[in-house]
Amino acid sequence: MTASTSHLVAPHGGKLIDLIVPTEKISEFKAHSKEWPSWDLTARQLCDLELLITGGFSPLRGFMTRADYDGVCHNMRLASGVLWPMPITLDVTEEFAKKLTPGTSKIALRDPEGVMLAVLHVEDVWQPDRKAEAKAVFASTSAAHPGADYAINKANPWYVGGKIEGMQIPPHYDFRNLRLTPAELRAEFAREGWRRVVAFQTRNPMHRAHVELAFRAAKQVEANLLIHPVVGMTKPGDVDYYTRVRCYQLLLSKFPQSTAKLSLLPLAMRMAGPREAIWHAIIRKNHGCSHFIVGRDHAGPGKDTDGRPFYGPYEAQEFFKKHEADIGVTMVPFNMMVYLEDQDKYVPDDEVKNGDRVLNISGTELRQRLNEGREIPAWFTYPEVVSELRKSFPARHKQGVTIFFTGLSGSGKSTIANVLLTKFLETGGRPVTLLDGDLVRKHLSSELGFSKEHRDINIRRIGYVASEITKNGGIAICAPIAPYDATRKHVRHMIEPYGGFILVHIATTVEVCEQRDRKGLYAKARAGILKEFTGISDPYEAPSDADVVINTGELSAEEAAQEIILHLEREGFIGTTAESA
């Protein structure tokens, strides 16, 4: 710690870690890297690596060894005894793990484009009990909990631990002036004479309630304010960080001059509630903050499949208080802020008196108002914030949408899709693209066969193209067989962050499809000439989550297309003539 920043809170563990090596060593690593196995980092691993290299995760010097991992899972302590609540691990495939020898192997850590970012000196390789990890860290093994689901179902099955030597942090080309490392932020605090700094963590746009909460917190502890939003991985379905950052920039002027600062944090959140609140505070401590705001349901993932919250509304505050001395950061607890209509002001909900008229808009209602193009009241947020949100979340009739057909060969998917295409082209408004199963096979997936693996690849390709069309405000009509439920769900999750996704199940029976057999495929399948034929020798998993179900044994193609159009109208994806103009 330099003399100029000595008045700030000390980093966790006493020293701010910096893992970037000298230039000459970088050249040496590049020369030797061809001898080492390479690992392409996932999105989460990229975020973790950046904060390891810059010291945001001080005192960690690399991905955790087994001793540190076990200590963190079981009692929130590193092997050294220092408090640390969250496992920071490098998960790899079994095939990759088998190549490694603890004590001698080195790994070239690369970004998805192949740029080498760091060297990992392998100290430990082990297969963790990921369900036990989820239970310890998240107090849940439910797939409805995004953190637990990632640990159990999405992370690779083997962990590699060891010290890191950094060559560069992952490159960023957006908001560069706001991406301050712990050392850079500490230097800014020192330059401006900030000694007491309270950090406000957020993964959502800020509205009037958040501004009031942050202002009150800073005033209460007589500190300057750091607005420190997460711009790494957050909860699925969150507003994209580009939109959020534009909103944060607009709101800086709402705070007294020279008392608030905005900086971006490339963190991959885990949504671990109480444990995550402590983790967030330690990270802000490393960035020079002496205080940390913990609000209602801090870093909570919402509710489980039974509608019960995973964590209590103020469980994070209670948990933080127990460990506050070890954290080394003072908590500033706050209740949820609510608007009192008669007094035209925001107050914590524990200050509401009998007879007060309280107004509030939930995140779900806000998104619904944006989708429907409805007014968002000035008491809730600022006009400039609404304007930014409307750019990213236009009314539904202006959004992109994917209409994704699934059904057996010969069920009528392509015919209905073509009728739908002509109706959209006739009315105009948005560009329309038809991704027919046979045409995609011909032009995009000609090298693929019909094994389960190849079918999945084909559908994911279609999903990716459809997501790009949807993202850019167009209509994508997809008409593959898409026999597997998990793959269809993957495509839905790929597209829904960008616009609408309508799953249309053409539920025509195999008997009717076989009677039609325009291409003679069923006859060949029955004769054993065609192997792995859906509905005969390969299974078709009927969807339980279809938005529209159609049986072409009962409806004509025109009638079926009209049913889909009516559904799109009900959901708001087709506006009136005046709205579409």
Which residues fall in each region the model found?
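Active-site cores that bind ATP or allylic diphosphates and position pyrophosphate for catalysis
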Residues: T2-K398
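Glycine-rich phosphate-binding loop of ATP-dependent small-molecule kinases
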Residues: E188, E192, F319-H323, M331-L503, ...
